């Protein structure tokens, strides 16, 4: 083993931890850093909506305030670390004595003055943004009425008779008023990329607004725990040019499409004459149920069960047969649908666009 000779004393350098190589200590420090950061990084997802990726004026203000707080916090953290390092590394000269009662200007400025400036700045910016978020749309702005149910969203447009579910459209570049109600428990309407949360409280009509700077589809979510399927209470906001928005309003007011194939006609008959019509409505037919979502445009929706599964034939068939296996606890009981009729029902529902 390598040894060092210090006068008449030999020292084993391999057994002394202070003599270990610097590369080894750096590798251990890097490994510890990775292990500590891994749990935090596992929560990141490129597909999840983020309030820090704003697509509207409302969320933009929230994101800017967040970044202001973040960088101010980083500055304070850096200041504290520098002072701490200085206190640990710089020793006081032995010939210097502390005079009790002397003015500590540094402590006064760093400990009271700087925090005061930060608090006043953040408070002023917060008040400015709060006032901007409270700036309501004009009287001619479209008004969308959203009602939260366990666990889906009913969507109507003021002045339009039809209804849809779990999907609302807005014109790009325009403010849209959103009136919120709950049919049961407390919910919270949140579109991270467009607007902060607004709670839905029983017996009250709450208002917020949406404004999208660019076209696209933005996922929203109930942000208040509301029971078993709270996680599967999502919705979609589709921002599109004004002409497409007007076309959506026209489709919302029109009767559902007429079946064009024999399978679709058989599916419509099974839907209207079966138990489906007791809970669901399809405009222009004898199905006028008001318990579950209106299915007049179900074929064009982005998902089934408010974000539970994709809207395709396989998932739709599974939902019809027994939605409890897909979204346990929802209010739709298992259906005794004849195996020969199930493809017809799927064909009919997929034609409703």
Predicted regions and their residues:
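Extracytoplasmic electron-transfer domains, predominantly the class I c-type cytochrome c fold
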Residues: 250-262, 286-353
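Membrane-embedded segments
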Residues: 152-156, 164-241
């Amino acid at each position: 083993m390598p040894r060092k000779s210090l006068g008449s004393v030999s020292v084993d350098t391999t057994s002394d931890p202070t003599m270990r190589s610097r590369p080894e200590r750096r590798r251990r420090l890097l490994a510890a850093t990775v292990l500590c950061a891994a749990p935090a990084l596992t929560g990141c997802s490129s597909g999840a909506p983020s309030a820090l990726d704003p697509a509207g004026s409302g969320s933009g203000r929230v994101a800017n305030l967040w970044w202001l707080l973040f960088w101010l916090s980083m500055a304070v953290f850096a200041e504290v670390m520098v002072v701490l390092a200085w206190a640990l590394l710089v020793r006081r000269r032995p010939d210097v004595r502390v005079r009790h009662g002397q003015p500590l200007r540094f402590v006064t400025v760093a400990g009271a003055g700087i925090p005061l400036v930060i608090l006043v700045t953040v408070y002023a910016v917060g008040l400015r943004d709060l006032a901007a978020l409270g700036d309501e749309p004009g009287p001619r702005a479209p008004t969308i009425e959203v009602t939260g149910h366990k666990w889906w969203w009913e969507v109507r447009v003021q002045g339009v008779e039809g209804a849809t579910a779990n999907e609302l459209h807005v014109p790009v570049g325009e403010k849209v008023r959103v009136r919120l109600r709950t049919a049961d428990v407390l919910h919270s309407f949140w579109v991270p990329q467009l607007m902060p949360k607004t709670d839905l409280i029983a017996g009250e009509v709450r208002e917020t607004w949406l404004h999208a700077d660019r076209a696209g589809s933005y996922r929203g979510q109930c942000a208040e725990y509301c029971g078993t399927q709270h996680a599967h209470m999502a919705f979609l906001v589709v921002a599109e040019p004004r002409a497409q928005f007007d076309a959506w309003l026209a489709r919302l007011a029109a009767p559902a499409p007429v079946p064009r194939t024999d399978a679709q006609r058989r599916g419509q008959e099974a839907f209207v004459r079966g138990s489906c019509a007791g809970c669901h409505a399809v405009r222009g037919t004898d199905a006028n149920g008001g318990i579950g979502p209106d299915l007049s445009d179900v074929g064009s929706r982005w998902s089934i069960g408010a974000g539970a599964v994709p809207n395709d034939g396989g998932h739709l068939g599974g939902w019809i047969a027994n939605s409890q296996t897909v979204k346990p606890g929802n209010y739709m009981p298992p259906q005794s649908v004849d195996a020969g009729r199930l493809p017809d029902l799927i064909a009919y529902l997929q034609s409703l666009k």
